[in-house]
Structure formats: C-alpha cells, structure tokens
C-alpha cells in the first residue's frame, strides 16, 4: 500500500454564533465605509440568547443605525422565530462603540510628506496551492462548500427542517507527492427542527448536501461519514453558544494548512494590516502559484505601527519552486506594493465589500469585489522569472 498522509479542515455556517458576530461587525463596517471611505473602524460583536452587544472604536463623521444593521444581518441569516431562542425582531441590541485614540491617528494617517503607516505592529501570512481550481487547500475548500450548501437548501426550502447553525469537517488523504487523492472522512452537524427524525435527516443531508458537493472520484467505500453524530441538534445558535467576532480565524483563512499571524479580520477597516496585509499576502501567493513559479507558496509580511515599509517579507515554496525562494522574494518586492497605502489602493479596499467575506472564508472566493483573488500579475511574474 502506498504511503499517504491525512489533513483535516473545518468550516462553520453563517448561522454559527461566532459567524453571526463576524457578519454584524462587517455589516457595520460596510455601512460606515459607504458614507466615509476614510473612516477608522474596529467593531467587535458578542451574541448570546436574546441579545447582541456591539463595542469597539470608530473615527468618522458618518452616522449609521447600528441596531437596524444588526437586526438586518440576523434576519438574513434566518433567525426569524422566537422558537429558535434568537429572533431578529425581539433580541436586544446594545451599542458600546467609542472613539479611536488620537495617538493612533498620529502614526497611521497620511499628512503631507508623511506616508500612511501600519495601523499596528504584527505579522500576516498569505498562502496558495494548486491543489484546487481556486488555488486553495482542498480540505477547507470543500468544508466551506458543504456549509454553503446547507444554507442554500435551508433557505430555498429543499430541506425546510434545517436551522441556521451548522459545522462541517473534511479529512483528505494526500499521496506521497503531497497531492489530494481521496476523502477519508466527512463530518456535518446541522441544527434542525424538533419534528424531523434522525434517520430522515441523515439521508437528506447525504443526498442534498454531501453528494452534490464532494467530487465522486474522491469518495469510496472507505470514506467515513458522520452526520449529526451526537444525535439531535435542536438547540443551537447564540442560545447554545456565545458568539464573538474574530474567533474563527482558521476557518476564515486556510483551514490550518498555512500559518496564521493571529489577527482577526472582521470589523476592521483596511488601515488595519491584520486584514489588509493578509489579503495582500493572499494576492501575492496566488499570483506566484498562478504564474507557475511554485505549486505551493506561503508569504509572511510584518509591520511596525506607524511605519509604512514592511519590517520583513519572506517566501516559502516548500521545495516546489521553479526558481529559488530568494528570486521569488525579489520579484514580490518589484511587482507588489506592500506598504499600507499602496496595498489598499492596489486592492481597492476602501469600499463596503466586507460583509460577504464574513462567512465561508475570505479566500478562494469568486466575484469582482474579492480583488485579492485576481491573478492579473501572473503573466508579468512568469516573464520576469524567465519561465
């Protein structure tokens, strides 16, 4: 038997408590950016039974109705009945947003000859791999697609007994060349109404969610399926668990296959390099892989608060590079702008584009607003590398 290794990633649905919080934070960010593209926003959300608490720091002259925004997000997700214990109409919405410190603005804002500095110190990673069509790791890609499908069949009425809270997990087998060759295990847990029998639920999830999403060539008689393995899952959402912004940073990125600098994304305007530089890192890594310079690429970028130039840029292609990592690193410096103001302009980030990122991953997504997914630098990189 040939040698193989296993790798697992998980995702959660838009109705998971932590993801509700992420979406509320990003909806508020979008509403502010729509009125004031120069706003500074750091918006955190907590959700629990019957309540939403929004807190953080904002600097803007714009006014937005935070209560209305939060209720709208919860309604769209599908918490629309008091039977679920969480309802967009009856939940309390509390606002504890304050002003951003003027000390931060001194180092971060552009003023005359002073170039915009990083909003904080920190390290960020970007990653890409050619094992899927979206140049993302297979486990996180299919984990996301499972919970996206759960939301789709819940909302369109195909499986009307499903409720918003759900989680998925996919374990892939990788061959001796490091390529995905089979799916070893699939876990899908979904909240549901009390009326459905477990046997009916499991059959419906298998036929309407798992089979349409996972490629048949990766499934076999050896694939293990765990559908609601603990039995019934009636109590869920913010009733079952408290939700907080920024607690699903591995779901948001690469499913654990790449390293993470620790900074969350949602609720942060693009002056925060936690978010914008991680997006730029993805853009760099994806273009390197799309150009054929490597099968797999991870970039680390780091910053000092108030300083524009990155304190470091490093590249790792895990031995898959067609040219050396040092050559790729030099190409990155020549072809990409990684100072805060430059990368914000490069990716056009001062726009209300963030709510769609707050569920089902920030990377490997399609749509013109996911500017960091473009591969428009691939040809220039390929030519510059002499490939």
Swiss-Prot record:
Pathway: Amino-acid biosynthesis; S-adenosyl-L-methionine biosynthesis; S-adenosyl-L-methionine from L-methionine: step 1/1. One of its GO terms (molecular function) is magnesium ion binding. Mg(2+) binds at residue 18. PROSITE patterns: ADOMET_SYNTHASE_1, ADOMET_SYNTHASE_2. L-methionine binds at residues 57, 100, 241, 272. Its cofactor is Mg(2+); K(+). One of its GO terms (biological process) is S-adenosylmethionine biosynthetic process. K(+) binds at residue 44. It comes from the Bacteria. Keywords: ATP-binding, Cytoplasm, Magnesium, Metal-binding, Nucleotide-binding, One-carbon metabolism, Potassium, Transferase. Its EC number is 2.5.1.6. It catalyses: L-methionine + ATP + H2O = S-adenosyl-L-methionine + phosphate + diphosphate. Residues 100-110 are annotated as: Flexible loop. ATP binds at residues 16, 165-167, 241, 247-248, 264, 268. NCBIfam families: metK (TIGR01034). Belongs to the AdoMet synthase family. Catalyzes the formation of S-adenosylmethionine (AdoMet) from methionine and ATP. The overall synthetic reaction is composed of two sequential steps, AdoMet formation and the subsequent tripolyphosphate hydrolysis which occurs prior to release of AdoMet from the enzyme. This is S-adenosylmethionine synthase. It comes from Marinomonas sp. (strain MWYL1). The lineage of its organism: Bacteria, Pseudomonadati, Pseudomonadota, Gammaproteobacteria, Oceanospirillales.
């Amino acid at each position: 038997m040939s040698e193989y290794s296993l790798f697992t990633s998980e995702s959660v649905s838009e109705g998971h408590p932590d993801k509700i919080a992420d979406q509320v934070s990003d909806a508020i960010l979008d509403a502010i950016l729509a009125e004031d593209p120069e706003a500074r926003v750091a918006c955190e959300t907590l959700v629990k039974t019957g309540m939403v608490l929004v807190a953080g720091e904002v600097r803007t002259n714009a006014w937005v109705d935070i209560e209305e925004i939060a209720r709208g997000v919860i309604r769209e997700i599908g918490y629309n009945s008091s039977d679920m214990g969480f309802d967009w109409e009856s939940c309390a919405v509390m606002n504890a947003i304050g002003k951003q410190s003027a000390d931060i603005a001194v180092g971060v804002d552009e003023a005359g000859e002073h170039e915009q500095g990083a909003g904080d110190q920190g390290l960020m990673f970007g990653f890409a791999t050619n094992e899927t069509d979206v140049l993302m790791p297979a486990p996180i890609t299919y984990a996301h697609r499972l919970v996206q499908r759960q939301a789709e069949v819940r909302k369109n009425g195909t499986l009307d007994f499903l409720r918003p809270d759900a989680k998925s997990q996919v374990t892939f087998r990788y061959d001796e060349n490091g390529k995905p060759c089979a799916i070893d295990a699939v876990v899908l847990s979904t909240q549901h109404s009390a009326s459905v029998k477990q046997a009916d639920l499991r059959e419906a999830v298998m036929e309407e969610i798992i089979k349409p999403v996972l490629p048949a060539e990766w499934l076999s008689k050896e694939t293990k399926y765990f559908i609601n393995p603990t039995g019934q899952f009636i109590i869920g959402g913010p009733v079952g668990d408290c939700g907080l912004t920024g607690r699903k940073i591995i779901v948001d990125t690469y499913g654990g296959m790449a390293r993470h600098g620790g900074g969350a994304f949602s609720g942060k305007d693009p002056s925060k390099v936690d978010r914008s530089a991680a997006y730029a890192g993805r853009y760099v890594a994806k273009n390197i892989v799309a150009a054929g310079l490597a099968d797999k690429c991870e970039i680390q970028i780091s910053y000092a608060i108030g300083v524009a130039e990155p304190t470091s840029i490093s590249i790792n292609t895990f031995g898959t590079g067609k040219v050396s990592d040092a050559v790729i690193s030099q190409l990155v410096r020549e072809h990409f702008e990684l100072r805060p103001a430059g990368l914000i302009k490069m990716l056009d980030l001062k726009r209300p584009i963030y709510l769609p990122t707050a569920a089902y991953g920030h990377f490997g997504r399609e749509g013109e607003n996911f500017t960091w997914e473009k591969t428009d630098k691939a040809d220039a990189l390929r030519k510059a590398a002499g490939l």
